[in-house]
C-alpha cells in the first residue's frame, strides 16, 4: 500500500515570489530537470482560474481579516505550503478523473480545516514525474497572522494521522507515512551527493592525466621550435657624403651590409620547423577531440547535477534544522504549559476545598450538605459543557468535577474500610 504524503513548508516574504514562479511555471527552472514542459498545460489550480500575484493575494487575505493595527513583521511566515502527493505507483493505478478527485478531496479537507478564505492557491502539477499539489495556507486566526499557533506540533501530527485516514474514507488505498521521513530524505540526498562527488573526483583525476599528456606534448612541440637562425644580410651601395677629387660633382659611394626582413636557416632546421608546425596542428586537433569526448561531457553533466543535488541537500538540511528548532521551541512551550496547568489544578483544588468548607458551615446536617454540594458540582458541570459547546471545544470533564469524583471515591474507600 502506498503512503499518503503531506509535508508543510514555511514561506516568508523573501521566498514567496520564487514559489509563485515555480508553481505557475512563470520561469524555466534551472534546478528541476523533472519538468516536462510539453505537459505543463495539464497543470491546474483548484482555487484560482488564472495565474495570480502571490504577494497581492496574501496581502488581501491578511488585510481582510486583520483586527489590529500592527504591521506584519518582515520575517513573518506568510504562507504554510502543504505538498500533497503519494508515490508514482499509486497515481498510475488511477485514471485521470480519480487523480483529480484525489486532489479535490484533499483541497476540500484543508479548506474546511483552515478556512476556504485562507487558501491562497491550490496548484496541481502533472508535468513532473509524480503528480502533486502545492496548497498555500495563510495562517490567519482570530484576526492575526499566527503560523506557530495554526501549525504547531499537534497540528503537524494531525496532518500525518488524519489526512491518510480521511483519504482512505474517500476510497483511496493509502496509509500513514513513517515518522522521521525528513531525516530519511536527507540521508538519501547525502548519499547521492557523496556518490556524485566520487564520480567527479574520478573524472577530475582522468582529466588531470590528459592535461599532463597535453602539457608534455605541448612542451615537446615548443622545444622543437627552438631553431637557430641568422639574419639575412644584403650588400648595398650607400653615399659617404664626400665628392670626387676630380670635381665632377659625383658623390663617393661605399658598400655596406644591411639586414633584410628574412632569416637564414639550415635545410635540416627548416625540415624540423615544418614538422613542428604539423605537430602543432595535430596538438590543436587533439585538444578539440579531448574536449568533445564523452568523459568531458560527462564531467560537465555530473558537475551540474552535483550542484543541483547539493542545493537540494542544503534545502533539506535547512528545513530539518528549522523543524528541530520548532520542536525545541515546542518542548519549552510544553514545559511552560505543564507548569501553568499544574498551578491551575492546585488553584482548582483550593477553590474546591474552600467551596466545600463554605457550604458545610452554612448547611445543617451531613446529608443536606452533600446534596447542596452535589448540586453545586452539577451546576459547574453544566456551565462547563455550555462553554465547551459554545467555543466548539472537545467535551471533557472539568477539573472541579474530577476533584469531586476523587474525593467521593476516597470517602467510599474509607467507608468500606470502616465497615470491614
Swiss-Prot record:
InterPro entries, per the entry: Mob_Pre (IPR001668)
GO molecular function, one term: DNA binding
Ligand binding (DNA): 44, 114
Keywords, ordered alphabetically: DNA-binding, Plasmid
Residues covered by region (Disordered): 388-420
Further information: Contains conserved positively charged amino acids probably involved in the binding of the pre protein to the RSA site.
Record-stated family: Belongs to the plasmid mobilization pre family.
Protein's name according to its UniProt entry: Plasmid recombination enzyme type 2
Lineage: Bacteria, Bacillati, Bacillota, Bacilli, Bacillales
Amino acid at each position: 500500500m502506498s503512503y499518503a504524503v503531506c509535508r508543510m513548508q514555511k514561506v516568508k516574504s523573501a521566498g514567496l515570489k520564487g514559489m509563485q514562479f515555480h508553481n505557475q511555471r512563470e520561469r524555466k527552472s534551472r534546478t528541476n530537470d523533472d519538468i516536462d514542459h510539453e505537459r505543463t498545460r495539464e497543470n491546474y489550480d483548484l482555487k484560482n482560474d488564472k495565474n495570480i500575484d502571490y504577494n497581492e493575494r496574501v496581502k488581501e487575505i491578511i488585510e481582510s481579516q486583520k483586527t489590529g493595527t500592527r504591521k506584519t513583521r518582515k520575517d513573518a511566515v506568510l504562507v504554510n505550503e502543504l505538498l500533497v502527493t503519494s508515490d508514482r505507483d499509486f497515481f498510475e493505478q488511477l485514471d485521470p478523473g480519480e487523480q483529480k478527485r484525489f486532489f479535490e478531496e484533499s483541497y476540500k479537507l484543508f479548506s474546511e480545516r483552515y478556512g476556504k478564505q485562507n487558501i491562497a492557491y491550490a496548484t496541481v502539477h502533472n508535468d513532473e514525474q509524480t503528480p502533486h499539489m502545492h496548497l498555500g495556507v495563510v495562517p490567519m486566526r482570530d484576526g492575526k497572522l499566527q503560523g506557530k499557533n495554526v501549525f504547531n506540533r499537534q497540528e503537524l501530527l494531525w496532518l500525518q494521522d488524519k489526512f491518510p485516514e480521511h483519504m482512505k474514507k474517500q476510497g483511496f488505498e493509502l496509509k500513514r507515512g513513517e515518522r522521521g521521513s525528513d531525516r530519511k530524505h536527507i540521508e538519501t540526498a547525502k548519499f547521492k551527493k557523496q556518490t556524485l562527488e566520487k564520480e567527479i573526483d574520478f573524472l577530475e583525476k582522468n582529466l588531470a592525466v590528459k592535461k599532463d599528456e597535453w602539457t608534455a606534448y605541448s612542451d615537446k612541440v615548443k622545444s622543437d621550435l627552438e631553431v637557430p637562425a641568422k639574419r639575412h644580410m644584403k650588400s648595398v651601395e650607400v653615399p659617404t657624403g664626400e665628392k670626387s677629387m676630380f670635381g665632377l660633382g659625383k658623390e663617393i659611394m661605399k658598400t655596406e651590409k644591411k639586414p633584410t626582413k628574412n632569416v637564414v636557416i639550415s635545410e635540416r632546421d627548416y625540415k624540423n620547423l615544418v614538422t613542428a608546425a604539423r605537430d602543432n596542428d595535430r596538438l590543436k586537433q587533439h585538444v578539440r577531440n579531448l574536449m568533445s569526448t564523452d568523459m568531458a561531457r560527462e564531467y560537465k553533466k555530473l558537475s551540474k547535477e552535483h550542484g543541483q543535488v547539493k542545493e537540494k541537500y542544503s534545502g533539506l538540511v535547512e528545513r530539518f534544522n528549522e523543524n528541530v528548532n520548532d520542536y525545541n521551541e515546542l518542548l519549552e512551550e510544553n514545559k511552560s504549559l505543564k507548569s501553568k496547568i499544574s498551578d491551575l489544578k492546585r488553584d482548582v483544588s483550593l477553590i474546591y476545598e474552600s467551596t466545600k468548607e463554605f457550604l458545610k458551615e452554612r448547611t445543617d446536617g451531613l446529608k443536606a450538605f452533600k446534596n447542596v454540594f452535589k448540586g453545586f458540582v452539577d451546576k459547574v458541570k453544566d456551565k462547563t459543557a455550555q462553554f465547551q459547546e459554545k467555543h466548539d471545544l472537545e467535551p471533557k470533564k472539568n477539573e472541579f468535577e474530577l476533584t469531586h469524583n476523587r474525593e467521593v471515591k476516597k470517602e467510599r474507600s474509607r467507608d468500606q474500610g470502616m465497615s470491614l
